[in-house]
Every structure is written in C-alpha cells, then in structure tokens.
C-alpha cells in the first residue's frame, strides 16, 4: 500500500479550475472508476449529449496563461522584426554565405534526401559568384563532369567532327581524369563503338598528349588487373580499345605484340579467344608496321592450333583468323575511311610497355580545391584559342547561330560548285586580256591591271596572261616587256611570280611554235636585261645533249641574242663571269663532264657567243688527262677503243667505199689484217715505205695473208679506187691481229686493188685483195711522218701493233719535203705491191681504184694527248 501511496504522491495533479473538481462523479467527457482488483464489466460509453449541455457554461481557459502567451508571441514578433531590420545592410554577403551553406548541405546529403527542383538548384548556383570559393569550384567541377560525359555519350560517326570541337571547349586539362573514366566506361558498355571512341581519343591526343597517355596508362592497368582476376569481359574491352588506339597510332604496336605474346604464352580457351579478337582488330596495322612481329604471332597461333589442347570452338576461331589474314583484312580494316581524321605526321605515338611502372592518377577523378583556379582557366582559354581558332570563344549555341552557320555552309558549297566549273577563272582571264588589249600604252595598262581584284591563289594568272598575250603577237612588242618590268619592280610578289613563270615556260617551251617561242624568249630577255628578274633564274637551264631539245636550244639562242642586243657583248660577258652569279650559271657552262663542257663550248660558238666560253675552254684544256690503258702483247688480239668525238681530232677519217675486196692470197705475215676504209680517193702515189696503217675505211673487210716487209723498200704502186677519204695518216699501234705467218723482210707488191685508205705509219693496213699483189705505183706525195696515235671516240681500230719504218719513196718532186704529220696521197694503183717473204714470194693482184684527196688538217683535240 505504501508503494501505491508513493506512486500516487509522485503524480502531479493539476489544479482544477474554479467551479470544477476532479471528484469521481460522472462527467461529460470521461468517467473514471476507483481502482478495483476485480475485472471491470463491459460498459458502454454514455452518450455525451446531456453532460455537454451541462458543462457548456463552464470556462476552460486560464486567463492569466492566455495573457502570458499573447505577450510572448508579441515579443517574438518584435525580435524578428528587429533582426530583419538589422540584416538589411549585409544582404549580399549573408546571401552568399547562406547559399554556400545550403549548397554544401545539399551536396553532402546522402542519396535519398530531399529532392531539389532544378529551377531552385540553378537559382542557388546563380547566387554563388565567388570564383575563389570552394563551392563555386565544386559547382564548376560538377558541370564539367556532366558536360564531358554527355558529349562522349552523344558521339557517333556522323557527328564526331562537331563533337570534338565542343569537347575541346571544356577544360580537358583539369578534367582529363573525368574524360578517361567516362570514355572507358562508355567503351566497355558498347564495344561496337570502340573505333569511334579511339578516333576521338586520337584527335584529343594530337593537341593534349597528356590526356592520351593517361588513357593508355589506365587501360593497361585495367588489363593487368582483369588478366590476374580472369575477368574475360574486362580483358576483351581493354584489349579492343588498345587495339584501335594502336591503329590510330596513339600507342606503339609493340604494346599490342606484348599483350598477344602474354595471352598466347600459356594458351587457354579464354586467352586464345581474347588474342584472336585482338589480332583481328590490330592485325592489318601489325603487318604494315611490324611484319616480323605479325609473323611471330601467327606462328604461335599455328602451333596452338596443331599442338595445344583447346576447345573446338577456339580452334575454329583460329582458322577463321587465318582466313581473315588471307583475305587481307577486308572486313577488318585498321581505320575506316570516315574515321581517318588525323594526319600521320600530326599524331603523337606513346611508347608504353606492358610491364612498365604506370601511375593511373586516380586523384584526378575527384574534386580538389585549386587556389590558382582563375589562372589555370585563363591558360586553358589561350590553349583552346590555339586549338580551335580565335573565333571559337565567342560561339553561341543558339538557334540563330545554327541557322546562320547552315546558310554559310550552303554558300560555301555553292562557291565550291562555281569554282569547279572554272567560270571565275575564265572571266578573270577575259578581263585581263581585254584590259591589255584596250590600253594605249604600258603605263595605262599597268594602272588598269592593278585595279583588278585577283582572288586569293590566282595571282599567277596575271603574269601568265601577260606572257601568253605577248606570244600571240606576230612580232615581239616591247609593250609587254615594259608591263612585265613595271610589275616586277612594283612588288616582290610579282617578281617571284615572273621567276616561277620563267621556269614553267622553259620546261614547256617545246609546246610552242617558233614564232611564239621567239616572242617569249625576247620577253624574258627584256626582263633580264632590265634587272626586273634575278639572273639566278638561269639556273633552271642545263645545257647538255640529254636535257635540251631543239626548242629549248632555240629559246636559249634567242634569249642570249636579245641580252647581247640590250646589254652589249662586253657587259654580258662581265655579267656571266660575276662571282656571285657563277653558281647559277653552272648549268649553262657545265664542268662536271668533258662531254657536256664541249657541248656547251660548241653551242655558244655556233650561235656567235664563243667569247663567253673562254674560261670554259681554259678549264677543258687544263683538266686532267684520262689514263691510257697499257698496251696488250704484240700477238694478242686487241680491240681499240671507239670514241664518239672523232670530229675534233686531227686524224679523224670519214671515208666511204663502194667496193669491198676480199683477199685470200697466201702470205707469211704474222697477222691477218683487217682494214675498214671509208676513203673514196683517187691518188697517184709512189710510196716507198712499208707502213702499217690504221684506217677507218668503208667497212671493206679483207683478209690478207701477204707478209709485211721489215726492210726498207721502194714500192711503186699505181692504184685506182673510188673513195672519199678525209682520214689522215695516223700512227696507231693497237689493233686486232690474227697472225699466221712471219712477215718477210722484203716485198714487192704489184696488185690492182681497190684501196680506200691512204698509207699510214704505226699501224698495219687492213687491205682486201684476192690475187698476189704486184703493183707499180706512182707516188706524188712524200711519206707521212709518224703521227701521234690518238684514241678517239667513235673509231674502230682492228689493226695489230707494228713498227713504223722510214720509206724512200720514188717521188716526182725534186726534193724530199719536210716531214709532216699528214701525208697527201694521190696515187693510182692498179696492182698491189708484191711482198717477199724469206723463202718464197706471194703475189696477189686485186683490181682497185682508190683516188683519195688529201685529208684536211684538223685541230688537235684538247682531251686526247698524243702517244709516242
């Protein structure tokens, strides 16, 4: 009982209002019964109607408490009004602080918290304008993340060219971690879009290599982890992305080779399947860039196919891979044409190995406060201007700008179509032509031409039209030369264009007829003589037989004649010997090859400008002599050199024969002599010398077995042969011998032979006769002296070496003439002279008529010294 009393005393009973009591009498609101231990009976609540009417007049509110509550409410209202009044001067700062606090609270709130409408969030963000605050930077970071993620999700083949500039508009240096995470996530979710993501990454890598390097690092780390965990899906996505980056040359193909060798080192069904997929994507690029690596990979596949214990499905995949390789990857090109957006020289290739120590820089994925945020943003704005151009900062994405850009693109397309029809070019040429033809003098013409607005890139049309109009005239008009001179001296641009025109017209001068060629040459002659063009333009001329045509030689001739007419020959020679311009004239006066040097000398001499080649002649005279090869043995057959420059040698012979004679007379000579004579001479000569002559006769091969005499003798021969001989007696000891009998010491020949060569010293005469020779000859010419044997171009020597002897000719002259290098033979021989051997005499007679006029004396060639 005591407990119950304590319990009752512990309860605070409120004071009843006046006129009311808490007695156990029934009340209108609730009935209470005294505590009883017996269970209470089921009682119904009495209807409240009667009690409510009874208590309606009783007041329930304490007036004092009501007054107190009213007073407190008024006090709170007054305090609130005072606070509001005191808060007005610091509105902005407090708004900023309140907005920051609320934004921070919202960002840190767990997911599932209070929903914030976008309009309220934007209004809240608009209130935060302090760029140095952490809240503003966090807000910008969130916007950057959403923008990069949205652009990557929108990209496809058709719009990649438009998405990439927008992507560069975002700060990819600050958000490179966000970019890499977003593009890797998008690629793993949609593998068919991997080439598009790789192309986007390749474009970004050309301008921001650190972004491409970070992407590669994360892909390699991702592959390593997935390979260790046997995560096939992640391995496939990582290797596919790396393969396409390798195709785009963002990463070196060595990385793909390392991954393939790792996968095939211990082949399993999954690893071989991943390797097959990687090879199909990167195989074409591997074979183009690293053939040995591709061969090693396919050899490994072949070994796995034949030896490894793998599933039938994987074996079939390897066989399909070999078929793809056989088809040259026609269904798996390295780069599709529409995604080949990066020039090869612009791409930056990273060399990262599979086993290198790599940092993924995961801290770039989360927000960090940047104290120098504004400076970094300004730096990226400059970089963006360099990447996209200066006008990219002011671009707006409104519909009006889109419409205007569409209109501009349509106008550009129309312009392209118009340009391709060459209508503008034809109109421009017509305008220039009419302007030139309607002008009275060159000054008026230049003034009108300067007013013509030339489109960009069509400036060369003006010099071209001036030269074309000049070439169309019947005779050269100085009017055009003055126009060209004026333009070339007005601006360096026109001077360069005329220099380019000179090179172009010289290369194509063979297309013009002679009259047009003459006008063009005189036009450029005027330009050079007035120094409107630099003389270095003559460096395009290479004066030699191979690089010139008849038209170009005529052009050079007329050009130099015009220069000589304007400048005078002394001044022209002075200009040609100018030390500063000498390198430009190396093509006109070549010193690299004696043949080209002679060609230049002969050319300028023939056109009347031999004075310009004096230094070239001196150079040719002093140039080192060619080495003469050693003489072969006397009995060995030798073939002398053939040279093509026979016209410059004293002993050059041009003779033509009509009757070849073949002699089969026996002789005891040690050689079978063959002579080829082109002589057509009618001569009467009494030559008392047995000479071994070397002749260029008219291809009358003869086989003579008559012995060659070794003693002094006097032979009288009377030959009559129709031959024209320009050959001079020469002493050559090299020939082609075929000896069959020793030569006799004396011989007396008496033959009628058709000889086409004059007698010579130093060589064995190649004569052709069919009968034993007994000849009685009348000699009117003294024997020639030993002429220096020269090796000439385009000459054939097939005579054996022999000894030259003096002969005592029976001549009609009262005294012996002085020895000379050339002999004049006018002999009429009806029989060849008999030659006597040591033991027997051979006779052969062959009818011949060989009138030979005296050869003309030619100057010694400076390139071939005489041999003694």
Curated annotation (Swiss-Prot):
<feature type="compositionally biased region" description="Low complexity">
    <location>
        <begin position="749"/>
        <end position="780"/>
    </location>
</feature>
<comment type="function">
    <text>Involved in pre-mRNA splicing.</text>
</comment>
<keyword id="KW-0539">Nucleus</keyword>
<feature type="region of interest" description="Disordered">
    <location>
        <begin position="389"/>
        <end position="420"/>
    </location>
</feature>
<comment type="subunit">
    <text>Associated with the spliceosome.</text>
</comment>
<feature type="compositionally biased region" description="Basic residues">
    <location>
        <begin position="667"/>
        <end position="677"/>
    </location>
</feature>
<dbReference type="InterPro" id="IPR050781">
    <property type="entry name" value="CWC22_splicing_factor"/>
</dbReference>
<feature type="domain" description="MIF4G">
    <location>
        <begin position="145"/>
        <end position="328"/>
    </location>
</feature>
<dbReference type="GO" id="GO:0071013">
    <property type="term" value="C:catalytic step 2 spliceosome"/>
</dbReference>
<dbReference type="GO" id="GO:0005737">
    <property type="term" value="C:cytoplasm"/>
</dbReference>
<feature type="region of interest" description="Disordered">
    <location>
        <begin position="626"/>
        <end position="868"/>
    </location>
</feature>
<protein>
    <recommendedName>
        <fullName>Pre-mRNA-splicing factor cwc22</fullName>
    </recommendedName>
</protein>
<dbReference type="Pfam" id="PF02847">
    <property type="entry name" value="MA3"/>
</dbReference>
<feature type="region of interest" description="Disordered">
    <location>
        <begin position="1"/>
        <end position="96"/>
    </location>
</feature>
<keyword id="KW-0508">mRNA splicing</keyword>
<keyword id="KW-0963">Cytoplasm</keyword>
<dbReference type="InterPro" id="IPR016024">
    <property type="entry name" value="ARM-type_fold"/>
</dbReference>
<keyword id="KW-0747">Spliceosome</keyword>
<feature type="compositionally biased region" description="Low complexity">
    <location>
        <begin position="678"/>
        <end position="709"/>
    </location>
</feature>
<feature type="compositionally biased region" description="Acidic residues">
    <location>
        <begin position="391"/>
        <end position="411"/>
    </location>
</feature>
<keyword id="KW-0507">mRNA processing</keyword>
<dbReference type="GO" id="GO:0003723">
    <property type="term" value="F:RNA binding"/>
</dbReference>
<dbReference type="InterPro" id="IPR003891">
    <property type="entry name" value="Initiation_fac_eIF4g_MI"/>
</dbReference>
<dbReference type="GO" id="GO:0000398">
    <property type="term" value="P:mRNA splicing, via spliceosome"/>
</dbReference>
<comment type="similarity">
    <text>Belongs to the CWC22 family.</text>
</comment>
<dbReference type="InterPro" id="IPR003890">
    <property type="entry name" value="MIF4G-like_typ-3"/>
</dbReference>
<feature type="compositionally biased region" description="Pro residues">
    <location>
        <begin position="626"/>
        <end position="635"/>
    </location>
</feature>
<feature type="compositionally biased region" description="Basic residues">
    <location>
        <begin position="855"/>
        <end position="868"/>
    </location>
</feature>
<feature type="compositionally biased region" description="Basic and acidic residues">
    <location>
        <begin position="53"/>
        <end position="96"/>
    </location>
</feature>
<dbReference type="Pfam" id="PF02854">
    <property type="entry name" value="MIF4G"/>
</dbReference>
<feature type="compositionally biased region" description="Low complexity">
    <location>
        <begin position="716"/>
        <end position="726"/>
    </location>
</feature>
<feature type="compositionally biased region" description="Low complexity">
    <location>
        <begin position="636"/>
        <end position="666"/>
    </location>
</feature>
<feature type="compositionally biased region" description="Basic residues">
    <location>
        <begin position="813"/>
        <end position="824"/>
    </location>
</feature>
<feature type="domain" description="MI">
    <location>
        <begin position="427"/>
        <end position="543"/>
    </location>
</feature>
<feature type="compositionally biased region" description="Low complexity">
    <location>
        <begin position="795"/>
        <end position="812"/>
    </location>
</feature>
